[in-house]
Amino acid sequence: MKALRIFCLGGLLLLYAQVGMGQDSIRTEHLQEVKVNARQHRILTSTSPLQLLDKGDMLRLGVTDMADALHRMPGINLRDYGGAGGMKTVAVRGFGAGHTGVSYDGVLLSECQGGEIDVSRYSLDQVQTLRLTIGDNDDIFISARQASVAALLAIETMSEIPIDQQPHLSTQLQVGSFGYVSPYLRYVRRLSDRFTLQAMGEYTYAENDYPFLLHNGKYTTHERRTNSRMNSGHGELNMHWMMGRRADGMSRNQLWAKIYYYDNDRQLPGIVRYYTNVTAEQLHDRNAFAQARWQARSLDDRWMLKVQAKMNWASSAYQDTLVANRRNDATYWQREFYTSAALMWMPDDGWALDYSADWMMNSLNSTLATDLRPHRHGILQSL
């Protein structure tokens, strides 16, 4: 009898469990994995004046070129030498363009002929962040060359890493008055979990034949600007390689490499003359460089090493076919080899010690018979 009661009780419990399972309205759904990919901005704290303008700010403010973006940064004095495709230099608080350094993806740009950097050569469509530092910055992990300038304008290009390994292509076309056309193309692909490739190119063409009124005594004529065509373009090839992973998934060693080429063949309109508008002056500027930057971190995050190397070549050719014997024609060439190493030690939280050493070699020559063809070697150190 006791066994029968136990059997009946077990049957009732089993029946209740089955009824409860049938009446359960809670469903289980498996959510797909979500990946969030974004650029992490460093929290910048500095005892010296610091200005930052990122891609979001540029889109919100509606800036269209590098000059317009630099005008939005307090402390910058932008000098525009005029003309379509003309030279634009930056100075900060009266220091002068020669004392204001401009870095491109962490490596300082150089110009051993005039000493002033033309910022109009760099496309705003490729720029991710503009950062202006006046005086000594709290970031001491920099090259000795960057530490030697009174103010530094850092240009950082777009370096986001796609979450997938599919090709990403973006295009843009700008059209304006007086024959202005500027197409832009950018290609990004993550070839593996550690290697990313990016290529971009842009081309700008403009006739610049804008109209104006010419007053000559009691006569007023409608004229157009002549010999003002601009034909320029530049391309970049960027590579990013992450080597070694830490426990948190971050890369311990990283390598960035860049190949850059710029070409600007433009006509120079000259001054306005009465009774004639014939002029034939031309200026052809070219610039090519290759740079690499390797950064490593120790396992205990106490030591950091950064090594940079760069080869730069530039030429500027002026010609005027209307001058007899072409005696005013001249071509200038400049070359630079540059390398830098920086080692930082962080013995404790809030303490850091950095030593940086740079070596550079510059040469300049031209077609002028009186050219001295100077060469220069330099070593810079900072602690």
Model-found features: residue ranges?
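Transmembrane beta-strands of outer-membrane beta-barrel pores
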Residues: 157, 173-179, 203-207, 261-265, ...
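Residues on the lipid-exposed face of transmembrane beta-strands in outer-membrane beta-barrel proteins
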Residues: 183-189, 237-245, 290-296, 339-347, ...
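Short, acidic, small-residue-rich periplasmic hinge/interaction motif at the N-terminus
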Residues: 23-59, 67, 97, 134
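Outer-membrane beta-barrel transmembrane domain signature of Gram-negative proteins
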Residues: 283-286, 311-383
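Flexible loop and strand-edge segments within Gram-negative outer membrane beta-barrel domains
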Residues: 206-212, 217-239, 244-305, 311-335, ...
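Extracytoplasmic beta-strand/coil segments of soluble accessory domains associated
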Residues: 67, 71-108
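A beta-strand signature from Gram-negative outer-membrane beta-barrel systems
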Residues: 124-170
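Outer-envelope beta-barrel architecture signal
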Residues: 100, 126, 163-169, 174, ...
